[in-house]
Amino acid sequence: MNQVLSKIGQVKANIDISGASTARSASLLCELVELQLMHNPKYQLPQALMPFRQKIFSHYGQDGMLAEIFRRIGEDTQRFVDIGTAPAQNNSNLLLLKGWRGLWADAGIAKDETLPSSIQILQREGKLKICRKLVTRESCRTLLSSRGFAEDLDLLSIDTGYNTHHVFTELLAFRPRVFCVAYNGMLPADLDWAAPYDAKAVWDGSTLFGATLGTISAAAEAGGYSLVGCELSGTDAFFVRHDLLKGRFLRPGDAMFHWEPLRMHLGQMQRHRSAMPLPA
């Protein structure tokens, strides 16, 4: 706790004396807000995931939180599916760097020849497959199974924007060990709500997208998974299969406790541009 308070003081001092650009000042303010948020006593409780958040390739701190989840439950097949991804910023680049194999599924991924060299090498080595199709409730199972990713998954990460919840409920049957699912942090956890399904719909920037954390958590519990934490940004929730919980996580399934409101501004801190290193 004292370390957090000390860091807050350092950032405040940097803001006061920086005389830096507007972008740099905004970055420092975001860092200050993040540090103050992390001062919340519930994040200091034993088994809390929040202290482990770390951004390497993920949009926010998902990299570190996923790493801690797998530290607790262990890695098995080291296979993942990342639905709704971007090559430079996602929840799976760090896993690829650790030697995992997986599938990216997103209609917006650029053509192979325009992807970074490191990604092209992974494709040639058979460590990464790419599906450039719109992932819908009707197509998701076939898209994964036809590419050999219907079973034996350690992680299934889903963020399709508008229809995330509907794709998630369809893929519960695939039984990955861990789900990372985007939720609607604009709405409270105790509201039972999901966006009406529309296969062609995309998020328009409004509150009409996805589903509330409570709705997703209830579907997860019914499907054999428990909520174990949310990213501080209020964007992603983490679910672990019931047989793997074994007292390793703080208040599993408690959506009201784990809920975080949407804080997209936390992604504005200045960092090095994400790029996958070339294999050694």
Listing of model-derived features with the role each one plays in the protein:
Residues 153, 167-168, 224-228:
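Short helix-to-loop capping/linker segments positioned immediately adjacent to catalytic or ligand/cofactor-binding
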Residues 82, 104, 157, 178-182, ...:
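A structural signal for short, well-ordered beta-strand segments and their strand-loop junctions
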Residues 2-39:
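N-terminal auxiliary segments of SAM/dcSAM-dependent transferases
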Residues 50-151, 155-158, 162, 174, ...:
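SAM cofactor-binding core of SAM-dependent methyltransferases
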Residues 24-74, 81, 140-144, 190-280:
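Rossmann-like AdoMet/SAM-dependent catalytic core
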Residues 91-92, 114, 167-169, 190-191, ...:
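Short glycine-/acidic-enriched loop or helix-start segments at secondary-structure transitions
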Residues 129, 166-202:
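A short alpha/beta connector and helix-capping loop motif
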Residues 97-99, 174-175, 221-223, 233:
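Short, well-ordered loop/turn elements at secondary-structure boundaries
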